[in-house]
């Protein structure tokens, strides 16, 4: 019988091409052998005694083999190779056990003799004593066999051995298939699981498998494939022109050290697996990364003979749907283990803390009022926003950038009272700046049918010489692709004392809808000046882009000029719009609609794209009137104003407002709508130890680090175009202890010093006043954490990052709202190099190299050309705003006064005593 079973097992192994048979296959062999050897011929002739004898014989063989099996399993657990004979013994023993089990539990209970014995036992027939004794013995043997089967400990080990061996055989088969596959092939979730399992059990000296997750850090931290060797490479951190060196030095600059070390050993792994989600942009970047690793690995070439690179079929969603979907892990640190000091203390970037995003800009409301709700349900193109919102909820990770520079400062805890004097001194964020490109938000383009290519940048540029791409850009000859490098911003300007208090963020009742008869060109049939007490979009108002979208060419005349109707004291808005549209880079992206792909519906402080959409519509209307209009009819910006009022009630009414506040509001609002990190939570403040170490660094390096931290929560084209940074340093005059905070700005408000009777005031005087060391009054003295009491102290502001476009607000109003009308002389070409922090002493935080901190354009000199002036006449509440804007070499300077505009005969007229907000563009080579 034994040889017969062995022969059958071997035949089945050959048929299934496997060294091991499954439990089901071995059970089938046992059933076949019972029919072949035991119940042949007439089953009725088989007696109970013969079957029990057969079981006892097989059981004795089973017990004998079990001793050998214990040694075999013990050797396997120690990692020893198992011979074919040992495998056969184990499989044979399982068949023996199964034969006994089937006979005892199935065949014998069906015998008529067994049924009679059970009946006799139950009735206790004393008339057949001899028969009863014989039956009693048979029943005892049967019960003993049954009990032996139930208590046998070996069968569980045998089953476990067979199952694990089958699994390992499958893993080996999957791995053999992978070994035969070429780099760039797709592997299934089954094959990946086999590789992961094989790697965990491998005794090989070669590292087996490295997984690269190509999603945002936030999504990676939420969940990723559970394996030891895995890194996150954010899709926005690299581009097609990168090499493997760039990936290591730029893309992974803010990654945890453990991940950087794994990537540095990439050429030592047997398999590298790339995976991402279903997002179109991420899938494209996955192919880009594959190409970099295969064709541009110059520092550590990857050989297909030694390391194979595969792509996970169906990506992470497919893994979740597979049988292995439960094998995922989360990387969110517990609140008790957050270490945010990393970069300052030891250069470690792994302690990233993700918290809830606070309100960064007081001018953008958390919740929208009723009129904005009307805009969200408007019947025309605004429903694109709703579609975008639905799709972006599925692809939310694209909007979340959790740069590892957060990790550089993972220890931002709640503000320390000892380290802060007031809200003015709370850490916000800062940097050295050039121009990183904003992260692309690959949501569907809401402007359907627009086939124009998008020139909006795709990835942040982290190299030092990124500035050189702008060296040849002249304002009159702007290359439309010149802003392929873009950096971020979200901030409050240092506002004039009269306007530092922001209106409370309360919900306003729904305003009365006002139907305005708008013609196809967006002109109002109302008079030039409309003065409703409040305005609201009616449900009949539409946002159809078809009448304002340009046709086919990208060669826009960015120096178009169109007047704007005054909607009732809205000159404050008109003058800022005219000046801002003098910023060619900004005008370009709203004309070619590339901005639309970057709207972040999930930005916590944004308007869900409302403000950006209405601003774009206004730009289109103005451009269309310039191109098509014969009479140059002024445009009514009423819908744009309604959108502004829906976001901030300060601009809902027809009352006069401060134009610099509107400028701040507009840029903040556009930033939040386009903020690709608007869903990211912020970091906590530094621990006292980390802050102490930061104080020892130069402003140049500390501000650069703080700027990178800022970019993890605020990253948009607005940031790149307008964002700067200054440092505010408090110093104790007793112990010389300092505390420095870094504040981003969009509009830089500078004070006007008292006029010297002998000399005129220059804008350089204003900057000197802004950056001078100030002795704090007794009631303002700093609570020095070193002295642990209020001490005589000083405060000094230093500009640490100068933006590409600098907006300067001359603080003409004092705390009593009195206006300073002194003439501040400002040049057409302004050199701010002397006011830029240039104190680098060669010292970096421990573990951080000089090539790890991006310069982002912060290379002197810093020279700026004037291109816009917003002027104010009268008082704060009863004045009027106009604007001077430079419109290229052909048109020169134009003067805008609401609906009217005219050329300026003498450009020196743009330098006047009514200047209130100045717009400068950085220039090179002058």
Swiss-Prot record:
<dbReference type="InterPro" id="IPR028889">
    <property type="entry name" value="USP_dom"/>
</dbReference>
<dbReference type="InterPro" id="IPR001394">
    <property type="entry name" value="Peptidase_C19_UCH"/>
</dbReference>
<comment type="similarity">
    <text>Belongs to the peptidase C19 family.</text>
</comment>
<protein>
    <recommendedName>
        <fullName>Ubiquitin carboxyl-terminal hydrolase 4</fullName>
        <ecNumber>3.4.19.12</ecNumber>
    </recommendedName>
</protein>
<comment type="function">
    <text>Ubiquitin thioesterase that acts at the late endosome/prevacuolar compartment to recover ubiquitin from ubiquitinated membrane proteins en route to the vacuole. Also removes ubiquitin from soluble proteins targeted to proteasomes. Is essential to maintain a normal level of free ubiquitin. Involved in the ammonium-induced down-regulation of the GAP1 permease and the UME3 destruction in response to oxidative stress. Has a role in the RAD9 checkpoint response to TOP1 poisons. Required for promoting coordination of DNA replication and avoids DNA overreplication.</text>
</comment>
<feature type="active site" description="Proton acceptor">
    <location>
        <position position="880"/>
    </location>
</feature>
<dbReference type="InterPro" id="IPR038765">
    <property type="entry name" value="Papain-like_cys_pep_sf"/>
</dbReference>
<keyword id="KW-0472">Membrane</keyword>
<feature type="domain" description="USP">
    <location>
        <begin position="562"/>
        <end position="923"/>
    </location>
</feature>
<keyword id="KW-0645">Protease</keyword>
<keyword id="KW-0788">Thiol protease</keyword>
<dbReference type="GO" id="GO:0031902">
    <property type="term" value="C:late endosome membrane"/>
</dbReference>
<keyword id="KW-0963">Cytoplasm</keyword>
<dbReference type="InterPro" id="IPR018200">
    <property type="entry name" value="USP_CS"/>
</dbReference>
<dbReference type="InterPro" id="IPR036873">
    <property type="entry name" value="Rhodanese-like_dom_sf"/>
</dbReference>
<dbReference type="InterPro" id="IPR001763">
    <property type="entry name" value="Rhodanese-like_dom"/>
</dbReference>
<keyword id="KW-0378">Hydrolase</keyword>
<feature type="modified residue" description="Phosphoserine">
    <location>
        <position position="443"/>
    </location>
</feature>
<keyword id="KW-0967">Endosome</keyword>
<comment type="subunit">
    <text>Interacts with BRO1, RFU1 and VPS32. Associates with the 26S proteasome.</text>
</comment>
<keyword id="KW-0597">Phosphoprotein</keyword>
<dbReference type="GO" id="GO:0006508">
    <property type="term" value="P:proteolysis"/>
</dbReference>
<dbReference type="GO" id="GO:0016579">
    <property type="term" value="P:protein deubiquitination"/>
</dbReference>
<dbReference type="InterPro" id="IPR050185">
    <property type="entry name" value="Ub_carboxyl-term_hydrolase"/>
</dbReference>
<feature type="active site" description="Nucleophile">
    <location>
        <position position="571"/>
    </location>
</feature>
<feature type="domain" description="Rhodanese">
    <location>
        <begin position="205"/>
        <end position="328"/>
    </location>
</feature>
<dbReference type="Pfam" id="PF00443">
    <property type="entry name" value="UCH"/>
</dbReference>
<dbReference type="GO" id="GO:0004843">
    <property type="term" value="F:cysteine-type deubiquitinase activity"/>
</dbReference>
<keyword id="KW-0833">Ubl conjugation pathway</keyword>
<dbReference type="Pfam" id="PF00581">
    <property type="entry name" value="Rhodanese"/>
</dbReference>
């Amino acid at each position: 019988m034994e040889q017969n079973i062995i022969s059958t097992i071997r035949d089945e192994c050959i048929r299934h091409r496997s060294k091991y048979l499954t439990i089901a296959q071995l059970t089938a062999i046992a059933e076949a052998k019972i029919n072949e050897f035991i119940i042949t011929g007439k089953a009725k002739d088989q007696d109970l005694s013969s079957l029990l004898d057969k079981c006892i014989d097989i059981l004795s063989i089973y017990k004998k083999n079990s001793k050998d099996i214990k040694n075999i399993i013990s050797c396997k657990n120690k990692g020893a190779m198992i011979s074919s004979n040992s495998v056969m013994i184990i499989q044979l023993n399982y068949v023996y056990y199964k034969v006994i089990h089937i006979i005892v539990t199935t065949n014998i209970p069906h015998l008529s003799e067994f049924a009679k014995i059970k009946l006799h036992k139950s009735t206790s027939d004393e008339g057949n004593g001899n028969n009863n004794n014989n039956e009693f013995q048979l029943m005892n043997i049967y019960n003993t066999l049954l009990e032996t089967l139930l208590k046998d400990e070996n069968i569980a080990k045998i089953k476990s051995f067979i199952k694990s061996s089958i699994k390992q055989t499958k893993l080996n088969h999957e791995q053999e298939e992978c070994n035969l596959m070429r780099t760039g092939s797709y592997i299934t979730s089954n094959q990946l699981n086999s590789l992961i399992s094989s790697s965990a059990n491998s005794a090989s000296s070669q590292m087996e498998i490295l997984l690269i997750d190509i999603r945002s850090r936030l999504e990676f931290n939420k969940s990723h494939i559970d394996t030891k060797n895995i890194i996150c490479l954010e899709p926005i951190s690299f581009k097609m022109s990168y090499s493997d060196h760039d990936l290591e030095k730029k893309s992974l600059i803010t990654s945890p050290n453990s991940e950087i070390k794994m990537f540095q050993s990439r050429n030592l792994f047997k398999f590298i697996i790339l995976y991402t989600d279903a997002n179109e942009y991420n899938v494209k970047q996955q192919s880009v990364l594959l190409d970099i690793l295969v064709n541009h690995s110059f520092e550590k070439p990857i050989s297909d003979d030694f390391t194979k690179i595969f792509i996970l079929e169906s990506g992470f969603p497919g893994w979740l749907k597979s049988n292995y979907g439960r094998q995922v892990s989360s990387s969110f640190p517990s609140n008790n283990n957050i270490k945010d000091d990393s970069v300052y203390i030891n250069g470690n970037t792994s302690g990233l803390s993700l918290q809830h995003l606070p309100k960064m800009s007081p001018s953008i409301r958390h919740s929208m009022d009723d009129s904005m709700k009307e805009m969200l349900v408007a019947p025309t193109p605004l429903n694109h926003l709703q579609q975008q919102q639905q799709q972006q909820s599925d692809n939310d990770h694209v909007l979340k950038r959790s740069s590892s520079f957060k990790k550089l400062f993972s220890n931002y805890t709640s503000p320390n009272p000892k380290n802060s004097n007031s809200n003015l001194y709370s850490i916000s964020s800062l940097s050295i700046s050039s121009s990183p490109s904003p992260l692309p938000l690959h949501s569907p383009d809401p402007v359907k049918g627009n086939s124009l290519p998008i020139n909006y940048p795709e990835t942040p540029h982290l190299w030092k010489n990124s500035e050189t791409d702008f060296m040849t850009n002249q304002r009159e000859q702007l290359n439309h692709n010149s802003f392929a490098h873009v950096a971020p911003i979200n901030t409050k300007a240092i506002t004039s004392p009269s306007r530092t208090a922001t209106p409370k963020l309360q919900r306003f009742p729904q305003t009365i809808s006002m139907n305005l008869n708008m013609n196809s060109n967006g002109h109002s049939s109302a008079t030039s000046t409309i003065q409703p007490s409040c305005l609201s979009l009616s449900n009949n108002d539409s946002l159809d882009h078809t009448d304002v979208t340009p046709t086919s060419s990208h060669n826009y005349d960015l120096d178009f000029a169109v007047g704007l109707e005054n909607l009732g004291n809205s000159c404050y808005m008109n003058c800022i719009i005219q000046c801002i549209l003098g910023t060619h880079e900004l005008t370009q992206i709203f004309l070619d609609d590339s901005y639309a792909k970057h709207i972040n519906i999930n930005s916590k402080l944004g308007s869900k794209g409302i403000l950006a959409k209405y601003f774009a519509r206004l730009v289109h209307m103005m451009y269309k009137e310039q191109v098509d209009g014969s009479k140059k009819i002024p445009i009514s910006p009423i819908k744009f104003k309604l959108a502004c009022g829906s976001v901030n009630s300060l601009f809902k009414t027809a009352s006069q407002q401060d134009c610099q506040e509107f400028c701040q509001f507009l840029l903040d609002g556009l930033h939040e709508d386009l903020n690709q990190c608007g869903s990211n939570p912020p970091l906590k403040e530094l621990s006292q130890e980390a802050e102490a170490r930061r104080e020892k660094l130069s402003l140049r390096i500390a501000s650069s680090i703080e700027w990178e931290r800022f970019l993890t929560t605020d990253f948009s084209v607005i940031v790149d175009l307008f964002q700067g940074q200054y440092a505010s340093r408090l110093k104790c005059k007793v112990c010389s202890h300092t505390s420095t905070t870094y504040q981003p700005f969009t509009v830089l408000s500078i004070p006007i010093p008292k006029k010297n009777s002998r000399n005129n005031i220059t804008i350089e005087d204003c900057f000197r006043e802004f950056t001078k060391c100030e002795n704090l009054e007794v009631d303002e003295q700093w609570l020095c954490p070193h002295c642990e009491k209020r001490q005589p102290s000083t405060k000094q502001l230093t500009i640490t990052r100068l933006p590409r476009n600098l907006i300067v607000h001359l603080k003409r109003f004092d705390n009593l709202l009195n206006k300073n009308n002194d003439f501040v002389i400002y040049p057409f070409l302004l050199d701010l190099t002397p006011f830029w922090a240039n104190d680098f002493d060669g010292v970096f935080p421990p573990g951080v190299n000089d090539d790890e901190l991006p310069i982002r354009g912060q290379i002197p000199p810093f020279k700026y050309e004037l291109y816009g002036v917003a002027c104010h006449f009268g008082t704060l509440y009863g004045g009027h705003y106009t604007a001077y804007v430079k419109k290229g070499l052909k048109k020169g300077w134009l003067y805008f006064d609401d609906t009217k505009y005219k050329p300026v005969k003498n450009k020196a007229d743009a330098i006047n005593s009514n200047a209130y907000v100045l717009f400068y563009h950085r220039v090179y080579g002058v």
